[in-house]
Amino acid sequence: GLVGSEMCIRDRLYTIPNVPYDEVPEGFGAEDNVVEKMGGMETELPKDALPHWELAKKYDLIDFDLGVKITGAGFPVYKGKGARLQRALINFFLDEARASGYDEIMPPTVVNTASGYGTGQLPDKEGQMYHCEVDDLYLIPTAEVPVTNIYRDVILDEKQLPIKNCAYTQCFRREAGSYGKDVRGLNRLHEFSKVELVRIDKPEHSKQSHQEMLNDVEGLLQKLELPYRILRLCGGDMSFTAALCFDFEVYSEAQKRWLEVSSVSNFDTYQTNRLKCRYRNADKKTELCHTLNGSALALPRIVAALLENNQTPEGIRIPKALVPYCGFDMID
């Protein structure tokens, strides 16, 4: 009957990705992304510079084998100054977000199916999420899912906008890539820490919001003194749900490659349409909000870049901004 066909149409609609904005470059993959900006100084490393997985072993910071023993590949154990560096980064990122006007949320790391559909991870990423089938719950791939779903089925008042939230969570992803040099060490994990920024705004303000978020993320990389670049993603490399996306990458001198540390996306009304997240304008009419989010920042590759780019013959130097959070200025 009618309900059956409505559900059938809805299921079809769930498989259609967002429509890219006009300013999205055409292209199929990473090679078609456009470099918008380069920043930070490239570091001069000692001749025998080591990749982070060797530094982690040398200074007893991260144990990948222990993680394999306890869980499996892609679940490292952080130890001593390695663990303290993680915690320092999380607190630094959250404090910086708060200084930029974001309200901190500590959400569940497990969500129901409705939440997965609300932000568009389902059905698109069904096979890439850890699914607890007995309870029909999913481990989150990003804090974007629980935080944005706070506003599911909500009508906001215009003066509540923009909503700016930040959240630190563990994130879980099944698709930790295959084997090879790109997935060694911290490059790709099944479980990792991340601080996420989420914004909900009026449609006419979302472009401005996007720019502010890009500035927030760039500020973090500048304070961490890391060489970085900003990419405008082409249509083929953008996520299923994004209308416009910029990636931040940091340069790993020891690996001689760029590592992605953040994606900052505008979803237009793609998520709010699913979430039924609206606001009441001055004329008392309800309109769909726009959602945006970005990592500020994802930890594993930031740790990798910090270890690799700051190695000296004496040890690993901690950037000035992090010293008060770490309680030490060298790993030796």
Question: Which stretches of residues belong to each language-model region?
Answer:
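Single conserved hydrophobic/aromatic residue that forms the stacking wall/gate
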Residues: G1-G4, I9
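Short amphipathic coiled-coil heptad-repeat segments
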Residues: R10-E23
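TRNA-recognition modules of translation machinery and tRNA-sensing kinases, especially anticodon-binding
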Residues: M38-D332
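Extended amphipathic alpha-helical scaffolds
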Residues: Y21-E44
